[in-house]
Amino acid sequence: MTQTINTNEVAYKKPQWLRKKLTPHTQVEMENLLKDVGGLHTICQEAKCPNISECFSNKNATFLILGNICTRRCTYCNVTTGMPKKVDESEIKKVTTSVLTLGLKFVVITSPARDDLIDGGAEQFYKVTKDIIEKSPDTKVEILIPDFKGNDESLKRVIESGATII
């Protein structure tokens, strides 16, 4: 049995909004700058996000605060699971320095789940966000927070940070 191919079919081009320019040099450049200011982690790198080049080329970055080790094991995420290190207070300055150095206008701050901390990391979210807003007032800050184990006080503290989007 032979199969015939209809050669009259029209080949459609992908719409412009679906096309993605891959700019690996921009990605490498931003990763090197992040290393230069203290080896910060981005969720883009840790979770092996397929859109990393797109975000970096648009001068957007999602910073992973509170380390790169999660206390939970979610099947959809590639972030390492284990016992995290203590909170790094110098991270606040490092994130803000990166925002200023890279000229970022939109920043997302997220973290792995930190069930080992009483507030789930809410105070660090507050401090990082406040510092960015204070030193780079034109930068919009979105925070993607963990569930803080349902702790209402932790959520209230994060809201007080003044983030543009929670």
Residue ranges and their predicted role:
Residues 1-72:
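Flexible, acidic/Gly-rich N-terminal and inter-domain linker regions that tether
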Residues 58-166:
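Conserved Radical SAM active-site core
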